[in-house]
Amino acid sequence: KAKVVKAQVDIAAIETSLKMYKLDNGFYPTTEQGLLALIEKPTTDPVPRSWNEHGYFEKQRVPKDPWGTEYVYLCPGVHGTFDLISYGADSESGGEGINADITNWEVQE
């Protein structure tokens, strides 16, 4: 349960970082640029013109989910402007319980 909560907190923090990126640059990073765009200035289009030289994460690294897997970032998203996903303990799409996906569009109970 604690790992699920940690993933939810991480996703909320990543969302905040993405929103700060958009406030500075007028757009979100593309799927191809990925979350790495929050710590390293992208060199592919669209190149951000007002990228924060300190990046958008306090620790200057993209967090992994509590199971050691990278968060999935899609922009444009299927469920919103962007989608953030942890595939849970099994690192596979779908599942139930601790294997359930944790996302930025569904509230976990």
Predicted regions, residues:
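Amphipathic alpha-helical segments typified by the pilin-like N-terminal helix
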Residues: 1-9
